Regions:
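Functionally constrained cores in energy, signaling, and assembly domains
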Residues: 1, 13-15, 88, 157
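Extended, solvent-exposed, turn-rich assembly/linker loops in the middle of proteins
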Residues: 31-111
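Long, hydrophobic/aromatic-enriched structural stretches that serve as scaffold segments
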Residues: 1-8
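Intrinsically disordered or highly flexible coil/loop and linker segments, enriched in small
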Residues: 8-15, 72-73
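Sequence/fold signature of self-assembling virion shell proteins
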Residues: 94, 99-176
Length: 176
């Protein structure tokens, strides 16, 4: 059970780092915020992607351009299935794929992946995994590793990873 909790905590940390740029720890008598130094300019607040009329392509274009202007070439877009479904129902994306003849037709995942790759050079990845935890009052609740309404653009290695997780003894443990 303890090892499962450690693995879950690392997944929570990764999800928070990718979706927020910070990691919040408020458990086991700790209350701390670890800031990974994501520049404020990179924390873009997009418009309402739940509105089928909203210009989602414009948001993606703005984020990709900002990164490219800084010499960074994003290769992945990480988000939730909720945001993916909003993209599939978006009229601008539907028109880009089907033209105006099939307006309102739901975009398939293959079509969405294809147009996002073609237009922006991005592979789509999703994270909808959840974990359960017990609150201080004893109630059991579920949390998400990656925030549902977020979209993260990043550069991944060939395997799709961003960064490396290191496991090993702490300096204190190494003294033994």
């Amino acid at each position: 059970r303890l090892s499962e909790s450690v693995v879950t905590r690392t997944k929570i940390a990764k999800g928070q780092a990718m979706s927020r740029g910070v990691m919040k720890i408020k458990e086991n008598n700790l209350d701390m915020l670890i800031d990974f130094g994501v520049p404020a300019a990179h924390k873009i607040t997009f418009g309402d992607w739940s509105n089928p009329e909203y210009d989602i392509f414009g948001d993606i274009m703005k984020a990709v351009k900002m990164l490219k202007d800084e010499g960074k070439i994003p290769s992945r877009m990480l988000t939730s299935d909720t945001q993916i479904q909003r993209m599939r129902k978006n009229k601008g994306i539907q028109s880009a794929i089907y033209g105006n003849i099939n307006a309102g037709r739901l975009v398939t995942m293959n079509e969405l992946r294809s147009i996002i790759m073609e237009e922006f050079g991005l592979q789509i990845a999703t994270c909808d995994e959840r974990y359960a935890y017990i609150k201080a009052d004893g109630s059991r609740v579920n949390g998400r590793y990656f925030d549902e309404d977020k979209v993260t653009f990043y550069t991944a290695d060939v395997s799709g990873r961003a960064g490396t997780g290191l496991w090993g003894p702490t300096p204190e443990e190494a003294e033994y």
